[in-house]
């Protein structure tokens, strides 16, 4: 069957996976050149992309598919099992740690290594799924050379990032803009994570609408869920948060695009709140992290700010459950996994009304979306939840219901639809 096609926003069309047609197992190569799915989210360049790659790979393998994941090694090449049916191959390219802005220069060499691995495989791959523009840059020549269909997921787009830069932030380079436009026109299919991303792809990047599919992420509710009261109390005690303090949590890599400065700026308007920042500074954003500490001191709220770095998934789940409110002040997000994880934990979210956050947060149901970046307005939205226990419970219960409607098996089903349709179209 052909996939159904439904109208999207701004005159764009989006393809939505049609049913869950069974078939023979697929051999899938997933490529994340610049960051390994085994890396801890919130550390270095690891974030929601890493979660999506790992969770979808495991779910695809759980459905009987063979999944190989390829990334760049910063040391010797190696391979190891990530989960049953999922093998991670770290390919040696360039040697050592390389700054992200230098990675495009290694794309050809990485692609050569990937092609050798594909040719050495016992059976050919049915599809290659490239995550992020750097992976697409490396993979497209391999796809053309070996005749393997390529599916692209961008995760972030330079077109949108450059529209919403923080003051003093460096714009994405022209090379990335041009590469994303070229990839959008040449790949067999694009798996977009939100309708907001589809709008940018079709209206700003020039992606052919008939090749764009909507496959949003999910959340693992066996990890992210409400915990016993004793667990919440233990987390708050470790953070030095008193019983009558409001615990506000902001999770993400520390960088200007994530907007943690706004979370700090709203604290003077929330005298009874403690802010916890969970995440490490991305390479090149160390000064931004320092500026957050400077800002907190200038505003007289440093004693109410805790920066705890990145956390393993179980510890993050405990933190989100212990929070009274989770804030997501990002300048742009293609989707935003943290709001889903908070919702599954039963914790209300206050987020910026931008991009995919308008889909991962249901305004007035699982949280509140805020226009603009006025600290007083953000504090008002957060304070309204902190001051109303009944509202906290109402938003939290709705969040749990919303999060339970979709899991990573649904994502795997839909990706299979994309892969099979793409392979069938290439075979015509």
Which residues fall in each region the model found?
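Short alpha-helical donor nucleotide-sugar binding micro-motif in glycosyltransferases
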Residues: 318-323
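Aromatic "clamp/platform" in nucleotide-sugar-dependent glycosyltransferases that forms part
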Residues: 331
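Conserved acidic donor-binding segment of nucleotide-sugar-dependent glycosyltransferases
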Residues: 363-364, 368-375, 384-389
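Carbohydrate-associated surface elements
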Residues: 196, 218
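N-terminal subdomain of nucleotide-sugar transferases
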Residues: 2-90
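Short hydrophobic beta-strand element within catalytic cores of glycosyltransferases
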Residues: 348-352, 361
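Conserved donor-binding/catalytic core segment of Leloir-type glycosyltransferases
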Residues: 242-258, 264-270, 276
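Nucleotide-activated donor-binding/catalytic signature segment of Leloir-type glycosyltransferases, i.e.
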Residues: 289-314
């Amino acid at each position: 069957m052909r996939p159904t096609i439904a109208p999207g926003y701004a005159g764009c069309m989006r393809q939505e996976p049609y049913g869950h047609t069974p078939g023979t197992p697929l051999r899938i190569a997933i490529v994340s050149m610049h960051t390994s799915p085994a890396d801890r989210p919130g550390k270095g360049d690891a974030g929601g992309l890493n979660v999506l790659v790992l969770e979808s790979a495991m779910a695809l393998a759980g459905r009987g598919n063979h999944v190989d994941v390829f990334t760049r090694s910063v040391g010797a090449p190696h391979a190891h099992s990530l989960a049953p049916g999922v093998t991670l191959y770290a390919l040696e390219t360039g040697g050592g740690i390389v700054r992200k802005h230098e990675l495009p220069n290694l794309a050809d060499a990485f692609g050569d290594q990937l092609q050798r691995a594909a040719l050495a495989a016992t059976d050919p791959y049915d599809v290659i799924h490239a995550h992020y523009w750097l992976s697409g840059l490396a993979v497209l020549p391999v796809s053309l050379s070996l005749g393997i269909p390529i599916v692209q997921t961008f995760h972030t787009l330079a077109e949108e990032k450059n529209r919403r830069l923080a003051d003093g932030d460096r714009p994405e380079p022209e090379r990335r803009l041009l590469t994303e436009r070229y990839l959008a026109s040449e790949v067999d299919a694009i798996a977009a994570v939100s309708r907001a991303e589809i709008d940018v792809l079709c209206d700003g990047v020039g992606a052919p609408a008939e090749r764009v599919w909507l496959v949003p992420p999910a959340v693992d509710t066996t990890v992210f869920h409400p915990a016993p009261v004793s667990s919440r109390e233990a987390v708050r005690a470790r953070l030095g948060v008193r019983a009558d303090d409001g615990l506000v949590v902001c999770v993400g890599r520390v960088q200007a695009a994530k907007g943690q400065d706004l979370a700090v700026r709203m604290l003077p308007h929330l005298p009874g709140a403690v802010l916890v920042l969970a995440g490490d500074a991305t390479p090149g954003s160390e000064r931004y992290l320092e500026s957050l500490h400077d800002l907190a001191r200038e505003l007289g709220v440093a004693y109410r700010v805790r920066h705890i770095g990145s956390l393993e998934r179980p510890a993050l789940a405990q933190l989100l459950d212990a929070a009274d409110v989770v804030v997501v002040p990002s300048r742009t997000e293609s989707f935003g996994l943290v709001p889903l994880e908070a919702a599954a934990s039963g914790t209300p979210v206050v987020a910026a009304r931008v991009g995919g956050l308008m889909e991962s947060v249901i305004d007035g149901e699982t949280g509140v979306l805020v226009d603009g970046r006025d600290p007083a307005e953000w504090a008002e939205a957060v304070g309204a939840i902190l001051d109303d226990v009944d509202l906290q419970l109402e938003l939290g219960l709705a969040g749990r219901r919303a999060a339970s409607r979709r899991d990573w098996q649904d994502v795997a089903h839909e990706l299979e639809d994309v892969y099979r349709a793409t392979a069938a179209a290439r075979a015509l």
